[in-house]
Amino acid sequence: MEMKDLRVEPKLTGYLFSKASRCKVPLSGTFELSPECNFRCGMCYVRKTHQEVQCHPRAMLTIDQWVAIAKQARAEGMLYLLLTGGEPLLWPDFWELYEILSKMGFLISINTNGSLIDEHVVEKWKQMPPTRINITLYGAGDQSYERLCHAKG
């Protein structure tokens, strides 16, 4: 089997991005919900602790602001939306926003370190599945992972 046969993205996706680019349609976008993360990965720039976020708050958007941006983006043709952070599951209004965005018709991907995925999260995603869940795997084993992320491997 060749690598091209292992490709999971449908050919339609490539066509959509090509057509959107020619028509100047913003087909995909990213919402960085919060800089807060429960890991301290050495290479990451969005890894503030809860205390750091509280002590040095940046102007974080409210759920209403994110929804307003999403409505504008959707009206312009955006279809694919990546939710990221920090750890997006730590953002207090994550589930409410996720549900709104899903109902707006976005194809949602989520970047997560996976540490907060439990039965509750799985059940939520079963009810309203994201298009993709990207779980970071930084290390060949527990030791290298823990060394890099400062979290249990």
Predicted regions and their residues:
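Conserved alpha-helical substructure of the radical SAM core
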Residues: 2-132, 147
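Active-site adenylate/phosphate-handling loop in enzymes that bind or generate adenylated species
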Residues: 143
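Glycine-rich S-adenosyl-L-methionine
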Residues: 149-153
